[in-house]
Design a protein with these regions (language model features):
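Anionic N-terminal interaction surfaces
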Residues: 3-76
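Short, isolated positions within intrinsically disordered regulatory regions of eukaryotic proteins
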Residues: 31-32, 77, 144, 165
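Generic detection of short hydrophobic beta-strand segments and adjacent strand-loop junctions
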Residues: 52-54, 82, 135-137
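Ordered hydrophobic segments in well-structured contexts
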Residues: 59-61, 68-71, 81, 122-124, ...
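Short coil-to-beta-strand transition motifs
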Residues: 77-88
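Short, charged, intrinsically disordered terminal tails
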Residues: 2-6, 168-171
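A generic structural motif
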Residues: 63, 88-91
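Acidic, Ser/Thr- and proline-rich intrinsically disordered linker/docking segments
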Residues: 90-171
Length: 171
């Protein structure tokens, strides 16, 4: 009888250990956490501004002290790091229409539209790179099965990114 109880306890302990291991692995591989780790690895420091699209597997982060911007795709497994001098500008695109723009040497096209019913809000970053001249990141996409945030929050994040880019391009 003691052996049966011992076996039952060992099986229960093994099941608890496996469950705990699976939960820790699931937590570690969570898309947002994984993208933040990839940004940290590519920039070398925690980004001071970040934009994440876990459903697309894309992210962008700014490091002001290191004067660099990182753009990642393929769930953070691929990406590029650009110096601030290589940034040409950025745009906010709502449902296929450019609603705000910042470009080197041009006046800013201010965001004068708040679209609470937008289907898609995209941040496009433009670089002086012939191979990868632009990077698009969906800040909001109504077609995705899981929604986080709202179109208004996405527009505010995009406007904040354009403000950062404008300050970098002027400075």
């Amino acid at each position: 009888m003691a052996d049966v109880l011992r076996v039952i306890l060992l099986v229960a302990l093994a099941a608890a250990a496996l469950t705990t291991g699976a939960l820790v692995l699931n937590w570690w591989m969570e898309p947002v956490r994984r993208m933040r780790r990839a940004l940290l690895k590519s920039l070398g420091v925690t980004p001071e501004a970040e934009a994440l699209s876990p459903a697309e597997g894309r992210a962008a982060g700014l490091d002001f002290d290191g004067a660099q911007v990182a753009v990642l795709w393929n769930r953070g497994s691929a990406g590029l790091v650009y110096a601030f001098e290589e940034i040409e500008g950025g745009e906010i695109i709502v449902d296929g229409h450019v609603v705000a723009r910042v470009r080197r040497g041009e006046a800013r096209k201010a965001l004068d539209l708040m679209a609470p019913e937008a289907e898609q809000v995209v941040l496009r970053l433009m670089f002086a790179d012939a191979r990868h001249p632009e990077f698009e990141l969906a800040l909001w996409d109504a077609t995705l099965p899981v929604q986080t945030g709202s179109p208004g929050e996405a527009l505010r994040l995009g406007r904040r990114w354009l403000s950062h880019l404008e300050a970098l391009l002027k400075g």
